[in-house]
Curated annotation (Swiss-Prot):
Record protein name field: JmjC domain-containing protein A
JmjC domain span: 103-252
Gene Ontology MF annotations: 2-oxoglutarate-dependent dioxygenase activity
Domain of life the protein comes from: Eukaryota
Disulfide bonding pattern of the chain: none
InterPro entries for this protein: Cupin_8, JmjC_dom
Annotated SUPFAM superfamilies: Clavaminate synthase-like
């Protein structure tokens, strides 16, 4: 049985660059429990609909697979179905749809297309030192209840902040990457609790050779720092809106 640990938590009131970069230097994930953003109060469903409306978006089924995983629909349709939990539970053959195949709005450039929304989360971007991370990219994510990503890693230091909802996140250090049985991690779902499908992470056969796994639950008003190269899995326990900010060191 693999050892499972909780991600460290820090309740600092005002996150500053010095503290943030100390975690980057140590290559260590951490939850900052007191994330402040205007978006937490402002981004109600009605507000987002008033800004974005019927704009066509491409909704992903997060297998990170082929283009057939992408379904076009109106933003208003996606958000309303998500809030009402109206997406199908079973496929056309009556089989239960896996979490990684449930709708997840993750490639919509909401913050770039609607600067008024980006203004609400600008403090995420400002935590990065542009002399070190000379490219900072921001993205927004809206996931329906029980949607999930597959296990993957990012190419930049990632600060993910929850605006609404709740996420269950699993993290694995780069030193354990070769110990992951990738096919099993895709074929057998990770179980969040006894009401969920799949295998509990500590008993999951895909990770039996890993030395340690970290988990956390990230809720509204909290941010998680995911160091570059760390493998992670994200399960939206509820309908969830979040923002990620990646700091990258690019050769100029």
């Amino acid at each position: 049985m693999v050892s499972v640990c909780q991600v460290e938590r820090n309740d600092v009131e005002n996150l500053n660059k010095e503290l943030f970069y100390s975690y980057i230097k140590s290559n260590k994930p951490v939850v900052f429990e007191k994330y402040r953003s205007q978006a937490i109060e402002k981004w109600t469903p009605d507000y987002l609909l008033s800004i974005i409306g019927d704009r066509e978006v491409h909704v992903n089924m997060c297998t990170f697979g082929s283009m057939s995983d992408i379904v076009p629909m109106k933003f208003s349709e996606y958000l309303n179905k998500t809030l009402k939990n109206e997406f199908p539970i079973n496929d056309s053959n009556g089989e239960r749809i896996k979490k990684i195949n449930k709708p997840y709005l993750r490639n919509f450039g909401m913050l770039d297309e609607f600067p008024i929304l980006k203004e609400d989360v600008k403090n995420n971007e400002s935590i990065f030192n542009k002399d070190v991370h000379n490219m900072v990219v921001m993205g927004s994510f809206i996931g329906c209840k029980d949607s999930a990503t597959n296990f993957h890693k990012d190419t930049g230091e990632n600060l993910v902040s929850v605006i609404h909802g709740k996420k269950f996140i699993v993290l694995i250090a780069p030193s354990d990457e070769t110990n992951i049985k990738s096919k099993l991690s895709h074929d057998i779902e990770v179980q969040f609790d006894s009401n969920d499908f799949g295998s509990p992470i500590e008993l999951h056969p895909a990770f039996s050779d890993c030395s340690k796994i970290y988990t956390t639950i990230l809720t509204q008003g909290q941010s998680l720092f995911i160091p570059v190269g760390w493998i992670h899995y994200v399960h939206n326990i509820d309908t969830t809106i979040s923002v990620s900010c990646w700091g990258k060191e690019m050769i100029m």
